[in-house]
């Protein structure tokens, strides 16, 4: 048996590893959807807040994110915002999402969590493979605190709107830079995986 020189083995690893580490196409789709949720929500919120309507922004924020989720439900995808301090009970994280949020909170506390952080992996749930993708939502600007800041400092009409729309709201008391939650995308994968 002929023995390969060590540099040949290293060269093969260098060529093979990038292919093995490449994202599945569903990961790029999930990344794009998460970006849509963040960008569309941000644009609509900025418009409502520019008009001096932080209480109206609460309704808009929910409707935009839910609209994007509905667009992808037909494909069997689940797209949602989750948090360990929910405003809408439908945004309560599942076990996978809770673990990612816990890990990110630790990273945030250590100063290692960036807005561009993401987590993706293929998991098996209920006998079916799925791509799980998450991207953090941070309290990135002072304007976020109009709806998510200290209760005594919320924007005009926000406390009243929260009591009406979300009587069990837990999503206040944040400070600038805090981890608010995450965009979570779950895409079922074909039987071939």
Short names for language-model regions:
Residues 146:
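Short, cysteine/histidine-rich loop/knuckle motifs that typically chelate Zn2+
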Residues 149:
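Short Cys/His-rich local motifs and their 1-3 flanking residues in nucleic-acid-associated proteins
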Residues 1-4:
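N-terminal secretory signal peptides that target proteins for export/translocation
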Residues 22-143, 152-193:
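Extracytoplasmic c-type cytochrome modules immediately beyond a signal peptide or single-pass transmembrane anchor
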Residues 8-18:
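Bacterial N-terminal signal peptides
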Residues 6-9, 160:
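Composition- and surface-driven signal marking solvent-exposed, interaction-prone regions
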């Amino acid at each position: 048996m002929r023995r390969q020189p060590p540099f040949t083995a290293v060269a093969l690893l260098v060529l093979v590893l990038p292919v093995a580490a490449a994202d599945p196409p569903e990961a790029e789709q999930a990344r794009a959807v998460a970006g849509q949720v963040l960008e569309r929500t941000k644009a609509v919120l900025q418009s409502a807040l520019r008009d001096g309507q932080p209480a109206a922004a609460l309704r808009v924020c929910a409707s935009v994110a839910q609209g994007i989720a509905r667009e992808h439900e037909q494909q069997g995808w689940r797209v949602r915002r989750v948090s360990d301090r929910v405003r809408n009970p439908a945004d309560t994280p599942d076990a996978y999402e809770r673990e990612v949020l816990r890990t990110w909170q630790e990273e945030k506390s250590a100063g290692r969590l960036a807005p561009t952080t993401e987590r993706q992996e293929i998991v098996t749930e209920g006998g079916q493979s799925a791509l799980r993708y998450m991207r953090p939502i941070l309290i990135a600007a002072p304007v976020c605190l109009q709806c998510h800041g200290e209760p005594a400092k919320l924007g005009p009409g926000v406390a009243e709107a929260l009591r009406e729309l979300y009587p069990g709201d837990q999503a206040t008391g944040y400070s600038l830079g805090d981890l608010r939650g995450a965009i979570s995308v779950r895409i079922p994968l074909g039987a071939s995986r």
